[in-house]
Regions:
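N-terminus-centered regions that define maturation/targeting leaders and the start
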Residues: 2-185
Length: 185
């Protein structure tokens, strides 16, 4: 009887170790980003610098138009770019302000108040297919202008949401650049 208990205990311990090993070796399926990317691309703007305040005209308190952006150091093997603008400080969690994909990888400038030509625009968290400027309920929020370089052109229809975009980007990100600005009411 003692040997049977030891064998059963050993089987449970081995099973537990196997489950633990499988769990911790499994890649994080919730992330659109691969484990390692180069982070060589740079995103800048003529109207605000990294960690500075975003001018009022680019917010819901102003003209609510997108700021001009410049993208440099895009890798040669890129097939398309994705632009995501979001606010991680929103009370309900990350709030998406703009989704644009299938941007031509030769694009170096995104003009003020315009989406890149021939790109697809997704539905932001305001429920619109356009840029929605900073509009925090209170306090200072951070706004990230993220540009992803992909090894493919995405087969995703205009009007898709952030979750759909994140899912289809998985495994295709070669590089990323971002600019962070702040805004407060």
């Amino acid at each position: 009887m003692g040997k049977t208990k030891i064998i059963i205990l050993a089987v449970f311990v081995l099973f537990g170790l196997l489950i633990t090993f499988i769990y911790f070796k499994k890649p994080n399926s919730n992330s659109a980003l691969p484990v390692q990317i180069k982070n060589m691309m740079t995103v800048t703007s003529l109207v605000f610098k990294q960690n500075e305040m975003i001018p009022k005209q680019y917010s819901c308190d102003g003209e609510n138009i997108n700021p001009p952006l410049t993208i440099v150091n895009v890798p040669d093997n890129v097939k398309s770019l994705v632009l995501i603008v979001d606010d991680p400080d929103a009370p309900s969690g990350v709030w998406t302000h703009w989704l644009v994909w299938n941007i031509d990888p030769k694009t170096t400038d995104i003009k003020e108040n315009s989406a890149p030509a021939n790109a697809e625009v997704g539905k932001n968290d305001f429920g619109k297919l356009e840029y929605g400027g900073p509009c925090p309920p209170a306090g200072t929020h951070r706004y990230f202008f993220k540009v992803y370089a992909l090894d493919t052109v995405l087969n995703l229809s205009q009007g898709a949401n952030r979750s759909q975009l994140d899912q289809i980007m998985k495994g295709h990100i070669i590089d990323k650049g971002e600019l962070m600005g702040k805004y407060s009411k």
